[in-house]
Each structure stands twice: as C-alpha cells, then as structure tokens.
Design a protein with these regions (language model features):
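Juxtamembrane/disordered regions of integral membrane proteins
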Residues: 1-188
C-alpha cells in the first residue's frame, strides 16, 4: 500500500488549528451575523458547515492516498456523534450545569473512539481523548471569555476562532495519534 508521507505531530496540530479555525470562524459567522433565524435552524446550519467542510480540510492529515470523499464522510459521521451529544446535553440542561462541558466530554469521547476504530488504533484512548478534550475545552472557553468581554459580532467571531483553533489542534493531534500504529505496521 502506498501512503502519503506522514505529517509530524507539530504539523498536524498546527494544520488542524489553522484549517479547523477557519471553518469554525465561518460556522460561527452564521450566529455572529444572524444569517439564519431561529435557534434550531441556526444550530443546524452551523453543524452543516462543520459536517461539509471539515473532512475535506483535515483530509490532508490522512496518510492513505485518494481518500478525500471517504474521509470527509467518516469525519462527518464522527462530528455528528460529537454534535448529537453536545446538543443533547446543552438543550436538556438548558444551558445550565455545564451542559456544554458534559456534552463535549461525551461527544469527544465518541469521536475519539470512532477515530481509533477507523484507523485501527487499539491503544492510547485515554491519552488521545484527554488531549482532544483539553485543546477543545481551552479553545471553547477562551472563546467564551472573548465573547463575554467584547460581546456582539466581534465576540461571536472570536469565540468561533478560538473554539476552532483549540478543537482543530486537538483533532490534528488525534489524527496523528490514531495513525501511528498504521504507519508502524506499513513501514515494517
């Protein structure tokens, strides 16, 4: 099997941060500029941006060649699992009791599990999940701080940028981590 040269962990984190940060900025622009009326429709439109664009952007980090569509569909599935858990807890807890944090915890655990299954990685779930959760949470809550401080359109866009940079860094690391066993197996 011919594979693409594997990206380093640093490159994966930086590439994930930049690419997912830009996608997140675009997604949060829907909220920032009030482009879609109604809460359910707005969240659906934001999720659609992530579902459609993220897999295409992060595909560059996959080592298997010619997997653009397959990876994009896989990523959409993994992101959908995350989004379902996040929305379920956020809406059920009505924005209280750290529903966003609990939703992220469960959603990112599901995403990590799906990535490990897809890439055949059988070890290091806790490490991979912990790093993803940490980067995501730092980005999300730093973005929230910016929104609290600046408010309005600027605050919303900054929230999107910070959330995307943090989440993207975690996703870049997750892809690097999950592909390590595959790289080791192929290079033997």
């Amino acid at each position: 099997m011919t594979i693409r040269p594997a990206a380093t962990q640093s490159f994966s984190i930086i590439f994930g941060s930049i690419s997912f940060g830009l996608i997140s900025l675009l997604a949060y622009a829907i909220w920032a500029f009030r482009l879609v009326p109604g809460q359910a429709a707005m969240y659906s439109a934001i999720a659609a941006i992530y579902l459609i664009l993220s897999g295409f952007a992060l595909n560059r980090l996959a080592i298997a060649p010619k997997v653009l569509l397959r990876f994009a569909l896989f990523f959409a599935t993994a992101f959908l699992a995350y989004a379902i858990f996040w929305c379920l807890l956020w809406f059920q807890l009505k924005g209280k009791y750290h529903g966003d944090l609990w939703g992220s915890l469960l959603g990112l655990a599901a995403m990590t599990w799906l990535f490990q299954k897809a890439f055949g990685s059988k070890r290091g779930f806790l490490a991979a999940f912990s790093i993803l959760f940490t980067f995501h949470t730092i980005g999300y809550y730093q973005g929230n701080e910016c929104y609290t401080y600046f408010g309005g359109t600027t605050g919303r866009l900054l929230w999107g940028a910070f959330h995307g940079v943090g989440f993207g860094a975690g996703l870049g690391n997750l892809m690097f981590h999950c592909q390590k066993p595959l790289i080791e197996k192929i290079s033997k």
